[in-house]
Amino acid sequence: MKRIYIIIGVALLLASCGKQYHAEKAVEAFVEANAEAPEKITHRDFADLGTTRHINDSLVTVMRQRGAEHYKRQISYPTMPQGDLYYLRMRYVHEGDTLQNTFYLDQELKEVVAFK
C-alpha cells in the first residue's frame, strides 16, 4: 500500500513539473513576440503555476485593452476559452527595474489569453 502512495506522489510531481515547463515556454514565446524590446528583458523568474476560476470574459477584455508597459499595443490573442484558466507570474529585470506580470493561459498551456 505504501508503494502505491509513493508511485502516485511521484507521478503527480512529474505531471506538475511538465505543466510548469510548458507554461513557462508559452509565456517566454509570448514575451518574445509581443514585448517592445525583448532583448532588454533579463533575469526572468517564474512563480508556481496556478489555476483560477475568477477570470471572466469582461476581465479578460479589460486586461487585453490595457496591456502593460513595455509591450506592444495591438497584440493578437486567441479566442477566450471556456472553463478555468492557468496563471503564471513572471518577475524580470527591464533596464535595471524589477517588474512583474501575470499571464493567463488556456487549459492546454499553449497560448496566453491575457496578461496584466
Regions found by a protein language model. Name each.
Residues 1-17:
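Sec-dependent bacterial lipoprotein signal peptides
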Residues 17-116:
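Cystatin/cathelin-like cysteine-protease inhibitor module
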